[in-house]
């Protein structure tokens, strides 16, 4: 079902139209809140399985349904950016693109490039994802950072940038806004621990990553990610 807040608004929506409906709601939210600080979290269903895309994108795609779903996200992004510019708040809005995991198998449309593994695994192909942050006039266009971070760090980092106040209860994120600016590469995170459900599968310290277990079987594999990002 399609749910808004706690209300079911449609039991069996046409999933090919979901991107357009999400985008319409996002634009309406921005319009109604443009004169005040706002937070918008937009998590498209594309390109998650099963793949559904509007017919107009399928007809234009050179990479099947997967390419059509990517095109629908591109379209949605352009609509939202146009709205921010139309309202005059484009340069006062931080936009973050990120993913919660790596791609599936390549024969399902996605690709993790040289990274080993896929979604659901603790190899870099399942864990390392791009993050693009846009803030016109504040974050230099084309700047890059390979400092290690996680989506848990967004809350304290953005809170600092907007001069907000964090909740008093303990949070897991670390303030990482230094990585947003001027090709900064120094991360405040030295240690990463990788679990697959209840199994501790890998530990990373700085550039070194030790794999301990995969699919219930113990292994001992150590990689220098600075020189071997593909864990070969």
Predicted feature residues:
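Catalytic-site neighborhoods of secreted/periplasmic enzymes
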Residues: 1-12, 105, 191, 212
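Active-site His/acidic residue clusters
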Residues: 6-8, 24-69, 104, 112-113, ...
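Soluble non-cytosolic domains of exported or imported proteins
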Residues: 13-21, 64-71, 145-149, 170
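Loop/turn elements at helix/coil->beta-strand transitions in domains of secreted/extracellular proteins
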Residues: 33-40, 89-95, 128-129, 187-189, ...
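Beta-strand elements within well-structured catalytic alpha/beta cores of enzymes
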Residues: 37-43, 70-73, 77, 94-99, ...
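Short, solvent-exposed turn/loop segments enriched in Gly/Ser/Thr/Pro and often Arg
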Residues: 40-50, 97-103, 172, 194-198
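Histidine-centered active-site microenvironments of extracellular/periplasmic hydrolases
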Residues: 50-52, 59-65, 69, 82-138, ...
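C-terminal cap/loop subdomain of S1 sulfatases and analogous C-terminal strand-loop tails that border
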Residues: 103-113, 117-124, 138-143, 147, ...
């Amino acid at each position: 079902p399609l749910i808004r807040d706690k209300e079911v608004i449609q039991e069996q929506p046409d999933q090919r139209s979901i991107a357009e409906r999400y985008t319409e709601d996002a634009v309406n939210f921005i319009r109604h809140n443009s004169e005040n600080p706002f937070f918008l979290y937009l998590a498209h269903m594309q390109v998650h399985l099963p793949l559904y895309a509007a017919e107009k994108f399928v007809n234009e795609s050179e990479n099947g349904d997967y390419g059509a779903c990517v095109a629908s996200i591109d379209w949605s992004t352009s609509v939202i950016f146009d709205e921010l510019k139309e309202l005059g708040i484009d340069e006062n809005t931080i936009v973050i693109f990120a993913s919660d995991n790596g791609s599936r198998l390549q024969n399902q449309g996605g690709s993790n490039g040289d990274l080993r593994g896929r979604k659901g695994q603790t190899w870099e192909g399942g864990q390392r994802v791009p993050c693009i942050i846009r803030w016109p006039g504040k974050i230099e266009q084309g700047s890059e950072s390979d400092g290690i971070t996680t989506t848990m760090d967004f809350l304290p980092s953005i809170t600092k940038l907007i001069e907000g106040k964090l909740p008093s209860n303990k949070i897991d994120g670390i303030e990482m806004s230094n990585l947003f600016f001027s090709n900064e590469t120094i991360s405040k995170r030295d240690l990463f621990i990788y679990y697959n459900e209840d199994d501790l599968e890998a530990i990373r310290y700085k550039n070194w990553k030790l794999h301990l277990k995969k699919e219930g079987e113990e292994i001992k594999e150590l990689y220098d990610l600075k020189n071997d990002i593909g864990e070969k």
